[in-house]
Amino acid sequence: MVVIRLARGGAKKRPFYNIVAADSRNRRDGRFIERVGFYNPMAAESEKGLVVNAERLEYWKQHGAQLSPTVLRLAKQAAKAAA
């Protein structure tokens, strides 16, 4: 099953997350199918902290991908900011 979830990157104490479509059997930070966006919780005011490709996210949802609870919250937040 395909899931859309966060893959952690960045350094110690400085998290950075890629929003990825991946097979549920793969590790959290392992192989993924496609990068759909990113989330930077430590972003400064002048930087973009959240970027989501809504078109690709919708594509994966239509093809049966399950969103993790955090990605669902972030997707709603990104849609609200874009509107």
From Swiss-Prot:
Q: Domain of life here? A: Bacteria
Q: Specify one Pfam family.
A: Ribosomal_S16
Provide any one GO MF term from the record. structural constituent of ribosome
InterPro entries in alphabetical order: Ribosomal_bS16, Ribosomal_bS16_CS, Ribosomal_bS16_dom_sf
What is one term from the GO cellular component aspect held by the record?
Answer: small ribosomal subunit
Q: Which UniProt keywords apply?
A: Ribonucleoprotein, Ribosomal protein
Can you cite a GO biological process for this protein? translation
- Family assignment? Belongs to the bacterial ribosomal protein bS16 family.
Q: Which HAMAP family match?
A: Ribosomal_bS16
Report what the protein is called: Small ribosomal subunit protein bS16
What is the originating organism of this protein? Aromatoleum aromaticum (strain DSM 19018 / LMG 30748 / EbN1)
